């Protein structure tokens, strides 16, 4: 198993580790409920160095990005970030990514840990002229500081002018470590928060700085367990659950990130040709129980789909789930098969949780 630069430190702090996407990663510290609550009400710190990073540079970089990704990047200015899907020729989802514009000829793409090798191979195979791709994952570490008090922790570390004001924006900051760090106002928790990218040889020093700054605010160390419950409440899709290579991109409720009016991109023809037959919905269980991943979903007595992600929501105190089901079904009599029992469920709007701004 691979290890992030923070693995030894987090073991010393009592992290319980699991194998995730080939990495030895902490699933929890004091407990998932404690960590989840900390992020919703205060602030939490995550090691997310398992994520992959790919640089695209050159005069053809923007054209390549326009070809590879479903969103439109012609309007993306330096210092801004934009979410997108990357599709195969059949319209299936290769990955979902964040694209950072460092300059019109330099882009930084954050990809899912389980897909780094696949993504780099796909990107490399579809480069347009005057574009170079480089996988910088092995040399990049990342910490996420998330929650209402994240901004106060960040203010103890960075000058005000170096802190990105808007969501989905970032700054490059010199002087904190040996090399520049990238401070991004992004996250995967449905809260305000920041993600800090740095060189691996600066990672331990960065952790010490952030951890010390967080003491005043009782910042919690958080693992992948809380990250999952937080993103699920925010209805944020997870690759391998809500989407994969076989999932038609138009069936997952992310059409706002698919710009069919822009010039050709990989998978566009397939999306125009194929009508969606599935949909992603949010449900809340009426009967007592928890709808876990892969549980069958029924409309009346008809099997119509399955649960892609489900949990007992720590914030809402209700069993919630995202489901992938047939399109145009009658949702008035939904149920989920949980260990042989049909539990009644109702469709609810997504996201399940939205922070008060």
Where are these regions (language model features)?
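Conserved, structured C-terminal
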Residues: 1-21, 25-29, 102-357
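Acidic, proline/glycine-enriched N-terminal capping motif
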Residues: 1-84, 92
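A subset of signal/propeptide-processing and intrinsically disordered low-complexity segments
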Residues: 42, 90-91, 223, 228
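Short coil/turn segments at secondary-structure boundaries
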Residues: 52, 56, 89, 94, ...
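Internal amphipathic helical hairpin motif
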Residues: 59-93, 151-179
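Glycine-rich, Trp-frequent "lid" loop and neighboring beta-strands that shape
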Residues: 98-99
């Amino acid at each position: 198993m691979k290890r992030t630069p923070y693995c030894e430190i987090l073991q010393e702090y009592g992290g319980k580790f699991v194998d995730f996407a080939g990495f030895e990663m902490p699933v929890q510290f004091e407990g998932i409920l404690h960590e989840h609550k900390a992020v919703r009400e205060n602030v939490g710190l995550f090691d997310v160095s398992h994520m992959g990073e790919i640089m695209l540079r050159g005069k053809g970089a923007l054209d390549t990005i326009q070809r590879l990704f479903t969103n439109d990047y012609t309007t993306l200015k330096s210092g801004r970030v934009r979410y997108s899907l990357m599709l195969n020729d059949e319209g299936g989802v290769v990955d979902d990514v964040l694209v950072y514009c460092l300059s019109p000829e330099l882009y930084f793409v954050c990809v899912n840990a389980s897909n780094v090798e696949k993504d780099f191979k796909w990107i490399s195979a579809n480069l347009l002229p005057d574009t170079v791709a480089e996988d910088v994952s092995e040399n990049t570490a990342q910490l996420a500081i998330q929650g209402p008090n994240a901004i106060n922790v960040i203010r103890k570390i960075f000058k005000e002018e170096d802190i990105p004001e808007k969501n989905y924006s970032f700054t490059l900051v010199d002087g904190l470590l040996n090399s520049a760090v990238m401070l991004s106002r992004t996250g995967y928790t449905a809260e305000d928060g920041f993600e800090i990218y740095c060189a691996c040889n600066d990672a331990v020093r960065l952790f010490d700085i952030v951890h010390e700054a967080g003491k005043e605010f009782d910042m919690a160390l958080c693992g992948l367990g809380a990250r999952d419950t937080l993103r699920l409440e925010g209805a944020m899709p997870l690759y391998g659950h809500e989407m994969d290579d076989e999932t038609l991109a138009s069936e997952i409720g992310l059409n706002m990130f698919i710009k069919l009016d822009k010039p050709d991109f990989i998978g566009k023809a397939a999306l125009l040709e194929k009508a969606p037959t599935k949909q992603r919905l949010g449900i809340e269980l009426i009967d007592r129980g928890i709808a876990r991943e892969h549980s069958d979903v029924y409309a009346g007595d008809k099997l119509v789909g399955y649960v892609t992600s489900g949990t007992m929501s720590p914030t809402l105190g209700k069993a919630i789930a995202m489901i992938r089901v047939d399109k145009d079904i009658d949702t008035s009599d939904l149920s989920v098969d949980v260990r042989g029992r049909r539990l009644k469920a109702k469709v609810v709007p997504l996201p399940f949780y939205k922070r008060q701004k």
